[in-house]
Design a protein with these regions (language model features):
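S-adenosyl-L-methionine
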Residues: 2-65, 75-82, 103-131
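Conserved beta-strand/loop positions that form the S-adenosyl-L-methionine
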Residues: 69, 92
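Class I SAM-dependent methyltransferase "Motif I" SAM/SAH-binding loop
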Residues: 70-74
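Conserved SAM/SAH-binding beta-strand->alpha-helix loop
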Residues: 95
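A short glycine-rich, Lys/Arg-flanked "PGG" loop and its adjoining helix->strand segment in the class I
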Residues: 156-170
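Conserved beta-strand signature within the Rossmann-like core of class I S-adenosyl-L-methionine
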Residues: 170-178
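Class I S-adenosyl-L-methionine
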Residues: 186-189, 193-234
């Protein structure tokens, strides 16, 4: 039987504080998984990591570790891994088809500096990432949660901002991209708070050299401008 992502209940994901409150930053999608995607998930060849309530023992220092949150079909993750073969990338997403796509491409291209997790990234940050251990975090095109009553679900908010800062090395970065102007405005306002300007520097920047994701292609086709942010942890 072909499984859809909606067959997963919220109880299958780690119960972080935010989830116990019934608030999550991701949205289950009604999407089908192909046979090739399912095969990649079922045969991960040690590239797929299970969630655990202990710190991740990968990679071995001094290899820099980067976290890619919500990688979609994995195009950006693959490009980063190819560009920086001496770095390590932990890619986290909750959607099985995308996980299958990324695992399949990693196997086909024989890329070994990426590990993949199908779970809630906030739970991973809270429980598996050592404080001060990340060289950078990528969050490209997170769900904008456009309705005002859903803004509390956005991944770029104060509580999560503090969590991200605690896991980054001094000088580590958080790269965020969005195609929704109201979300971009709220990100600018959040990082401009006095308490945050003491901890973070930089902000909006010209689009860096990075892979164009499938979602970004659609946004551009529909006429939405993309805003990139690059914040450095002090």
């Amino acid at each position: 039987m072909v499984e859809s992502i909606t067959d997963h209940s919220i109880s299958e994901f780690p119960q972080t504080q935010s989830l116990r409150r019934g608030i999550r930053t991701f949205k289950p999608r009604r999407s089908r998984i192909t046979k090739s995607q399912q095969h990649a998930v079922d045969n991960p060849q040690a590239l797929l990591i299970d969630f655990q309530y202990e710190f991740l023992n990968w990679p071995h220092p001094p290899t820099p570790l980067y976290l890619d949150i919500g990688f979609g079909n994995g195009a950006s993750t693959l490009a980063l891994a190819r560009q920086e073969p001496d770095s390590a990338f932990l890619a986290v997403d909750v959607h099985t088809p995308g996980v299958g796509d990324l695992l399949s491409e990693l196997h086909e291209q024989e890329i070994t500096n990426v590990r993949v997790m199908e779970t809630d990234a906030i739970a991973v940050l809270e429980n598996m990432i050592r404080p001060g251990s990340l060289a950078g975090i990528y969050t490209l095109f997170p769900d904008p949660w456009q309705k005002a009553r859903h803004h509390k679900r956005r991944i770029v908010q104060q509580g999560i901002l503090d969590l991200m800062h605690s896991r980054l090395t001094s000088g580590g970065f958080w790269h965020i991209a969005t195609d929704w102007p109201h979300y971009a405005e709220s990100i600018s306002e959040l990082f401009a708070r006095p308490s945050n300007t003491k901890k973070w520097s930089s902000g909006k920047q010209a689009r860096p050299e990075r892979a164009v994701t499938r979602y970004e292609e659609r946004a551009i086709f529909e006429g939405r401008a993309v805003t990139d942010f690059h914040f450095l942890a002090g």
